[in-house]
Amino acid sequence: MDGVKCQFVNTNGITLHVAAAGREDGPLIVLLHGFPEFWYGWKNQIKPLVDAGYRVIAPDQRGYNLSDKPEGIDSYRIDTLRDDIIGLITQFTDEKAIVIGHDWGGAVAWHLASTRPEYLEKLIAINIPHPHVMKTVTPLYPPQWLKSSYIAYFQLPDIPEASLRENDYDTLDKAIGLSDRPALFTSEDVSRYKEAWKQPGALTAMLNWYRALRKGSLAEKPSYETVPYRMIWGMEDRFLSRKLAKETERHCPNGHLIFVDEASHWINHEKPAIVNQLILEYLKNQ
């Protein structure tokens, strides 16, 4: 991508591959991708944020694409994932950062905002609830059980890796809709994603984020008192119920929720103009 420079950054005992763009003296925005993406999932957001004067970094998170993939499920507990990002923030700025996260990246962002708020100025969470809402509401809300059933499957050893690798990563491709939506994803985009998934050890590392859940990754009850936030939510998300979004807004008093019609879990790809507008509007007006 034009204007994006990739580098390797040591943080929290590992090395992360980081895409960086924008003026070095601009306010720092950290973009955190979710499963099964990598830094390139923010391709529609980086330039508008840079054009608005921000310094933007988008890491491949631990276990993804070109970043380190430590062995063992315990290496993917949410406190560890959070500390990776704290290390990045402190290397790129002496000030507080703005963190924008989608899916699992949003879970890390929420956890950072709830447990180490001194590093954040603002949080924007895209189609991801506060982790403690996810943990406490899901067992009491049967419609979410089916939506989350894949998480139980991911706990199995080896079998999920084999199934995700079948037919040239067809399951992951279809989960995002890469090959089915040429208006959103070019053939180059599809190739980039599949190359990321093919990295040695990547599938196991990516799945270990989920496997760490059974080891108490979310055992801590982080505060609902977070930094100022905006939550953006595609109404047609087939993985996460809108109830989780509403419960997050109810419990977390320092922000607000915006629903977007005709958008799914992958809203940052489907409605980039709207997402970018909602991000920049919030950052400028609050």
Swiss-Prot record:
It is an enzyme of class 3 (hydrolase). The active site is at D103 (nucleophile), Y210 (proton donor), H265 (proton acceptor). Keywords: Hydrolase. One of its GO terms (molecular function) is hydrolase activity. It comes from the Bacteria. Its EC number is 3.-.-.-. The keyword Hydrolase applies. Residues 27-272 form the AB hydrolase-1 domain. PANTHER family: EPOXIDE HYDROLASE. Belongs to the AB hydrolase superfamily. Epoxide hydrolase family. This is AB hydrolase superfamily protein YfhM. It comes from Bacillus subtilis (strain 168).
